[in-house]
Amino acid sequence: MEQNFNLYHIFYTVAKCRNISGAARELYISQPAISKAISKLEQSLGTTLFYRSSRGVSLTEPGEILFVQVENAFQAITQGEEQLQRFQKLGMGHLSIGVSAT
């Protein structure tokens, strides 16, 4: 799962940057490693996700579909983390109540 998450994170960053070198700088990963990850993801999905040119990359139709889904997933993760942080700030915890018999 972690491997797939990393591939989708790389895919998402390349799509946002619209070029591999920008994504490599943002992710602190070499350009060849980015290219290899994208190729691995494309191979596992059985489709081409990017059109490649000397000026950068652009999403294919399947790439656009995947981008929306990955973006939604990342937003859901972020929202979940924010909800957990709010929960923790509320001081939710264990409450003990003692009563005595009269």
Residue ranges and their predicted role:
Residues 85-102:
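Interdomain hinge and pocket-entrance segments immediately C-terminal to HTH DNA-binding domains
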Residues 7-14, 66:
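Short alpha-helical "packing" element that flanks the helix-turn-helix/winged-helix DNA-binding module
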